[in-house]
């Protein structure tokens, strides 16, 4: 039986101001707050785009962890990475180099007079992901990553050799990944040392060491989403651990990744601690997030079991550097943690998706064996980063559906939970003014085979005695979820503030609700998930009196785009006034054109040639489904989307046009699976919201609603006049 769970007094009219696409895109975007060793100040970066100047600005700021007061540190856009050396000294990467075109530099600055810092080292290329520790000797040991040649030297784009031909030649896959054609360069972690000179200033001591190049075909961080969480440096400065996809198996067919351990000075060949022959046996999936304990004696990391499944459950493992023994923790815990931090030598905090939120969990290492279930430290919001501030307190950075950024102080005592909210974006940013927890609630309802969760997001001035058209949003993945978190791309509140009640379900295949729900989508893309969505729509129709399903619209991206295409040829498709597909698959046989072959082979239980019927079982392009197409349909597909190539969107548009279904095709030649450029994002929002508003009637009801005509880009239409 379904139930509506109000997170606050949403029955009262919301005081929120309407969140427009322009406000969403131009609102400040902030990084995690990183505390100094004493835990009284944190540093974070911010960036902001202006539609007046059509430029972005960036800055670094300080957050007082007692008062929540924010003060500027620097607005120098060349400052790209900052780490604390002590309570009052910062080490950072300067993105320019006066002597080396395309190079960068390491600088040291004091907190009280940041502009008076000095250059400590020259770097031969563009570097990112700085991590550093100060050893007992006073030396600074650091690591960062850059592109590399196979000979171990750093790749500098401005100094690189160019060829007269544009040809690309491949003898193996990948050919391209995400939005990039592979080349002979790769990501690599480099290590270096800074020593104090006789003038009490730090300076480079020796050349950088490439810690990845000694392993043929290794790469760290691993693209497209790898970053500094793919590696770590021990507190004593002696060791570096990094993740790399396994170089001994075909990377396009496996998710297998190893954690390599190597001396910081590169004096020994990196060793894969969980490579072939290591214990526990049979654990061969993706590895990530290596983190050293504060005493440098242990290394925690996450690993999946299945070498072909990107959404397998992650388990925490502890590697003892002395004995080389590996111990799994909380193996019966039905969650999949994605981040780890040690608070002391015997305690770990893990972050994990958890029923539509991102919560933190406390794990005492010695007690967390067997069927141990961790206790929650947070509950309800989405914690994206966390650091030990001092004593028993964490500094937690995250977001919610109504706030793009918050920083909380959270106790390591589960009974205390959140001690204090220091700052929240919706309380300090004019663009988000008035947004709050009253804008959202959630529902649980009976799905195809189990209870299903969905978020409900309300429009500006919501009054439950009135009715609002339904905006039905379908997430991608397919192993993904709608969370109580902010998005600058698919933001439910922006949809809601056009005048909709947004319902965002987490059907079969969604993550954060246990393995069984996540795994049940395998070879079942148009089965149980579709039935869950039908039941979600029916629950809304029958139970939420303030929602007008007769004027409903639906939209989805990636797998959500596939589902919208599937809905177009299904009974549910006739219940919507308009549909939007963003980068969705349409033709079953086209799945072989993707890059990560292990994904499709796992989802459909075999290769394209061995189990072709599995690939075609839920085919939106089947003739009998095409004959049912009738609902006006907007298609977005981008040229740099190599996961689902642009031909998928063009194929769907061709069919809709020939069938006479009102349709439009939106294409960005310089965007990938996502739309991230601010100006492109504005057009995306204008077209998506304008399309939905046109057919739902919102455009007639709300004079401030976005319309298709808001876009200044000309529309190509060479059809003869009707």
Swiss-Prot record:
One GO process term, biological-process aspect: proteolysis
EC number: 3.4.14.-
Residues of this chain annotated as glycosylated in UniProt: 75, 78, 86, 94, 151, 253, 448, 605
Active-site residues from the entry: 558, 641, 673
Biological role stated in the UniProt entry: Extracellular dipeptidyl-peptidase which removes N-terminal dipeptides sequentially from polypeptides having unsubstituted N-termini.
Gene Ontology CC, one term: extracellular region
One of the record's GO molecular function terms: serine-type endopeptidase activity
Chief location: secreted
Name of this protein: Probable dipeptidyl-peptidase 5
Name of encoding gene: dpp5
Extent of the signal sequence: 1-18
Family the entry assigns: Belongs to the peptidase S9C family.
UniProt keyword Acyltransferase, yes or no: no
Broad EC category: hydrolase
Organism for this UniProt entry: Emericella nidulans (strain FGSC A4 / ATCC 38163 / CBS 112.46 / NRRL 194 / M139)
InterPro entries (alphabetical): 6-blade_b-propeller_TolB-like, AB_hydrolase_fold, Peptidase_S9_cat
């Amino acid at each position: 039986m379904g139930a509506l769970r109000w997170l606050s007094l949403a029955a009262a009219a919301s005081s929120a101001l309407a969140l427009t696409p322009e406000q969403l895109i131009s609102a400040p975007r902030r990084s995690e707050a990183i505390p100094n060793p004493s835990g009284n100040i944190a540093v974070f970066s911010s960036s902001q785009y202006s539609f007046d100047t059509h430029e972005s600005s960036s800055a670094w700021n300080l957050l007082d962890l007692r008062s929540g007061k924010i003060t500027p540190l620097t607005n120098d856009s060349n400052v790209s990475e900052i780490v604390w050396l002590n309570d009052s000294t910062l080490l950072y990467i300067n993105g320019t180099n006066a002597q080396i075109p395309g190079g960068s530099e390491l600088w040291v600055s004091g907190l009280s007079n940041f502009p008076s810092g000095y250059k400590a080292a020259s770097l031969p290329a563009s570097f990112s992901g700085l991590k550093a520790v100060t050893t007992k000797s006073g030396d600074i040991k650091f690591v960062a990553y850059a592109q590399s040649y196979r000979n171990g030297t750093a790749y500098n784009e401005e100094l690189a050799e160019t060829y007269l031909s544009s040809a690309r030649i491949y003898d193996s896959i990948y050919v391209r990944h995400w939005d990039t054609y592979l080349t002979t360069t790769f990501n690599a972690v480099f290590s270096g040392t800074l020593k104090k000179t006789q003038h009490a200033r730090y300076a480079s001591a020796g050349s950088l060491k490439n810690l990845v190049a000694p392993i043929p075909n290794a790469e760290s961080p691993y693209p497209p989403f790898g970053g500094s969480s793919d590696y770590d440096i021990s507190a004593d400065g002696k060791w570096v651990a990094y993740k790399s996809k396994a170089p001994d198996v075909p990377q396009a067919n496996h998710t297998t990744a190893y954690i390599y351990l190597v001396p910081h000075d590169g004096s020994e060949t990196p060793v894969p601690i969980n490579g072939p022959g290591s214990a526990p046996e049979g654990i061969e999936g993706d590895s990530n997030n290596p983190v050293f304990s504060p005493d440098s004696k242990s290394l925690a990391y996450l690993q999946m079991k299945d070498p072909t499944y990107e959404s397998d459950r992650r388990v925490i493992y502890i590697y003892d550097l002395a004995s080389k023994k590996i111990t799994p923790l909380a193996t019966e815990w039905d969650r999949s943690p994605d981040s780890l931090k040690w608070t002391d030598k015997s305690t770990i905090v893990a972050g994990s998706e958890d029923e539509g939120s991102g919560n933190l969990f406390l794990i005492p290492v010695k007690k967390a064996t067997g069927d141990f279930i961790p206790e929650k430290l947070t509950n309800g919001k989405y914690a994206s980063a966390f650091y030990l501030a001092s004593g028993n307190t964490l500094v937690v950075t995250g977001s919610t559906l109504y706030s793009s950024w918050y920083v909380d102080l959270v106790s390591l005592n589960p009974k205390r939970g959140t001690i204090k909210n220091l700052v929240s974006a919706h309380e300090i940013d004019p663009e988000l003014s008035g947004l709050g927890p009253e804008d959202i609630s959630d529902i649980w309802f009976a799905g195809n085979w189990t209870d299903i969760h969905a978020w409900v997001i309300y429009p500006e001035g919501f009054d439950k005695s009135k009715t609002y058209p339904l905006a039905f949003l379908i997430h991608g993945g397919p192993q993904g979820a709608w969370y109580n978190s902010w998005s600058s791309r698919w933001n439910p509140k922006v949809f809601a503030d056009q005048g909709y009640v947004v319902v965002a379900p987490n059907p079969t295949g969604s993550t954060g609700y246990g393995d069984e729900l996540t795994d049940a989508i395998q070879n079942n893309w148009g089965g149980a998930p579709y039935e869950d969505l039908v039941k979600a729509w029916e629950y809304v129709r029958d139970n939420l009196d303030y929602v007008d399903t007769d004027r409903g619209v639906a939209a989805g991206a990636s797998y959500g785009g596939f589902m919208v295409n599937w809905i177009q040829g299904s009974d549910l498709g006739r219940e919507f006034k308009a549909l939007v597909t963003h980068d969705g698959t349409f033709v079953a046989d086209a799945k072989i054109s993707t890059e990560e072959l292990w994904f499709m082979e796992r989802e459909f239980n075999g290769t394209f040639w061995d189990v072709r019927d599995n690939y075609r079982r839920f085919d939106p392009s089947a003739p009998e489904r095409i004959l049912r197409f009738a609902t006006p349909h907007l298609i977005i597909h981008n040229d740099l989307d190599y996961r689902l190539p642009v031909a998928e969107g063009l194929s769907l548009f061709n069919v809709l046009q020939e069938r006479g279904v009102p349709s439009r095709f939106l294409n960005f030649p310089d965007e990938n699976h996502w739309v991230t450029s601010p100006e492109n994002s504005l057009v995306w929002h204008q077209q998506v919201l304008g399309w939905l508003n046109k057919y739902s009637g919102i455009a007639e009801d709300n004079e401030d609603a976005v319309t298709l005509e808001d876009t200044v880009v000309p529309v190509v239409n060479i059809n003869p006049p009707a």
